[in-house]
Structures are given as structure tokens and as C-alpha cells.
């Protein structure tokens, strides 16, 4: 369990401490690389959907993990290396990594 919960515990709020706990869990359990999609900013207001290969997570000493953006992933789109908020990518499939990303995104988007 990512946050040390049992099946009947309520989900805790998103805060710095819980984000670090979730980061440790994902670092130990995700299998990289995996495929995803994300919306890449282009200019001020435009975004385009791009395929993405997720290759890892930035360490807490490489970026700020906060309640606004959460855990930051790293990877490559067809054009360049990119860093992105992990909760903003879309994963498909039933692999354990895909389920972990969807669970994290659900918690991050609904408990902050």
C-alpha cells in the first residue's frame, strides 16, 4: 500500500509528507520505461496531445514536490526529453505500473 493504509482506512490529504511517502513507494514499485500520453504546452494557450515514454521520477532533491504539481516524472516525447506532473499523464493497460499511476492521479486530484 502506497501510504501504509489498510483497505478500510480513509485516504489522507495531499501534503508534502504524504507526497514524499508516495514518491518512495512509486520509486520502489514502478517498472520503467512505460508508455503514456500527455498534453504538451505549445505557446501560451495551446496544448497538443503527445505520446510519451516515462523513464523515471525526479528525486525530491532535483525538484520541489508540492501540492500544486505533485510528483514529477521524466521521460521522452517524440521531440525531446520532458519533465511533467505525474498526475497529468494518461496511461492505458492493466500492468501494475499503469494501475499505480492511475491510483496516484486519483488520490492527488481528489484529496488536495
Where are these predicted regions, by residue range?
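Basic/aromatic-rich interaction segments and small domains that mediate binding to polyanionic partners
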Residues: 1-27, 31-111
Amino acid at each position: 500500500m502506497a501510504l501504509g493504509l489498510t483497505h478500510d482506512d480513509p485516504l489522507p490529504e495531499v501534503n508534502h509528507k504524504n507526497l514524499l511517502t508516495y514518491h518512495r513507494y512509486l520509486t520502489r514499485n514502478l517498472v520503467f520505461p512505460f508508455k503514456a500520453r500527455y498534453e504538451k504546452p505549445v505557446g501560451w494557450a495551446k496544448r497538443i496531445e503527445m505520446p510519451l515514454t516515462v523513464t523515471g521520477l525526479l528525486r525530491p532533491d532535483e525538484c520541489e514536490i508540492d501540492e500544486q504539481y505533485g510528483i514529477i516524472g521524466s521521460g521522452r516525447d517524440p521531440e525531446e526529453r520532458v519533465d511533467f506532473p505525474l498526475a497529468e499523464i494518461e496511461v492505458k493497460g492493466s500492468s501494475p505500473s499503469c494501475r499505480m499511476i492511475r491510483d496516484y492521479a486519483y488520490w492527488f486530484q481528489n484529496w488536495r
